Amino acid sequence: SEMGPLVTKEHLERVKGYVDLGVKEGAKLIVDGRDIKLQGYENGYYIGGCLFDHVKKDMRIYKEEIFGPVLSVVRVTNFDEALQLINDHEFGNGTSIYTRDGDVGRTFANKIKVGMVGINIPIPVPVAFHSFGGWKRSLFGDLHMHGPEGVKFYTKLKTITSRWPSGIGSDPEFVMPTMK
């Protein structure tokens, strides 16, 4: 896959620090992208994808938002436990489910409490005209400023209610109009 650099050296060091911490906390690092070197971009802030397995709920790599290419597998025994695990988390940016069962996908989308839901896609990053952002402590500010919510924020709403009675020459009435 293709991924650009992180924004700053501090961001890169923070993400690498989370990977180090995950190893220290006992999660199994399956894919380690910390030492990636790109020819011609040696001074860039690059880190390859990292994948942890056997992550536990008390680990910081589970409890905190990393904002880097780090995925964690937290094992559960059934669908309801998976829903509960995600819904109980204090953050709610995005989550994904992979399934061949449409009923499971719809149930997941309806019951999950996060801002962005992916079904059979990795991280759900919507296209430009959709709002971007999470729920709970993952939302920065009080509005999603990208997409329709941003347009609504910067737009003055005007509501017009009208009635077009038949006949221009009718006498004025002082009654609430009703449908006939």
Features from the language model and the residues they span:
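Conserved C-terminal structural/oligomerization subdomain of aldehyde/semialdehyde dehydrogenase
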Residues: 3, 19, 24, 39-180
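Short beta-strand to alpha-helix junction loop
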Residues: 5-15
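Short secondary-structure junctions
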Residues: 26-37
